């Protein structure tokens, strides 16, 4: 519970669905979303280019692609509701955009959990200049 409170305090200044996404990540992985995923590999965090470094980074690549398929939505600022049923993330009722954004975030949080065993600390705070190649196609 203490960790949840600390993450919530850290995310107070975060806009829109990034808050919900962070809470999903915490719930699925037990990891602090800011320190564990914000600057991981070539795709976790702002932007992205090159080849994903591992399965966790590929989760972020797929998440970026998912957001890219929502041209009429604002994934980083539109808020949505979700809850958990028997431990599973369930996106709540909302607009079409809110539901699709929630589903993108849900899939990424689950992907992070499924790849916890291969999470590699050498990719935390990974330098952007090492991600030189053109981005893969979604």
Swiss-Prot record:
Effect ascribed to mutating residue 93 to G: Is 1.6-fold less toxic than wild-type AtxA, and has 1.1-fold lower enzymatic activity on anionic POPG vesicles and 1.7-fold on zwitterionic POPC vesicles
Highest taxon, organism lineage: Eukaryota
Organism of provenance: Vipera ammodytes ammodytes
Tissue expression remark: Expressed by the venom gland.
Residues that bind Ca(2+): 43, 45, 47, 64
A GO CC term assigned to this protein in UniProt: extracellular region
Example GO biological process: lipid catabolic process
Outcome recorded upon mutating residue 79 to S: Is 2.6-fold less toxic than wild-type AtxA, has 1.4-fold lower enzymatic activity on anionic POPG vesicles and 1.2-fold on zwitterionic POPC vesicles, and has 3.5-fold lower activity in inhibiting prothrombinase activity
Major place of residence: secreted
Signal peptide (UniProt feature, chain positions): 1-16
Site keyed Putative membrane binding site: positions: 18-19, 34-35, 39, 46, 76-77, 79, 82, 124-125, 129
Keyword annotations: Blood coagulation cascade inhibiting toxin, Calcium, Disulfide bond, Hemostasis impairing toxin, Host cytoplasm, Hydrolase, Lipid degradation, Lipid metabolism, Metal-binding, Neurotoxin, Presynaptic neurotoxin, Secreted, Signal, Toxin
Outcome following mutation: residue 114 to N: Is 3-fold less toxic (by intraperitoneal injection) than wild-type AtxA (by intravenous injection), has 1.6-fold higher enzymatic activity, has 2.8-fold lower binding affinity for CaM, and has similar binding affinity for bovine brain receptor
InterPro entries, sorted: PLipase_A2 (IPR001211), PLipase_A2_Asp_AS (IPR033112), PLipase_A2_dom (IPR016090), PLipase_A2_dom_sf (IPR036444), PLipase_A2_His_AS (IPR033113)
Cofactor(s) listed in the protein's UniProt record: Ca(2+)
Effect listed in the UniProt record for changing residue 117 to N: Is 30-fold less toxic than wild-type AtxA, has 3-fold higher enzymatic activity, has 20-fold lower activity in inhibiting prothrombinase activity, and has 4.5-fold lower binding affinity to CaM
Disulfide linkage: 42-131, 44-60, 59-111, 65-138, 66-104, 73-97, 91-102
Similarity remark: Belongs to the phospholipase A2 family. Group II subfamily. D49 sub-subfamily.
Gene Ontology terms for molecular function: calcium ion binding; calcium-dependent phospholipase A2 activity; phospholipid binding; toxin activity
Enzyme active site: 63, 105
Protein name as catalogued: Basic phospholipase A2 ammodytoxin A
């Amino acid at each position: 519970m203490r960790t949840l409170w600390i993450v919530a305090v850290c995310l107070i200044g975060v806009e829109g669905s990034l808050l919900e996404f962070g809470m999903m990540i915490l719930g699925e992985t037990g990891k602090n979303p800011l320190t564990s995923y914000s600057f991981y590999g070539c795709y976790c965090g702002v932007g992205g280019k090159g080849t994903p470094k591992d399965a966790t980074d590929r989760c972020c690549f797929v998440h970026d692609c998912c957001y890219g398929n929502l041209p009429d939505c604002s994934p980083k600022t539109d808020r949505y509701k979700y809850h958990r049923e028997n431990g599973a993330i369930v996106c709540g009722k909302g607009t079409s955009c809110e539901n699709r954004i929630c589903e993108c975030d849900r899939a990424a949080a689950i992907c992070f959990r499924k790849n916890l065993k291969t999470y590699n600390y050498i990719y935390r705070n990974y330098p952007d200049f090492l991600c030189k190649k053109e981005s893969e196609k979604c």
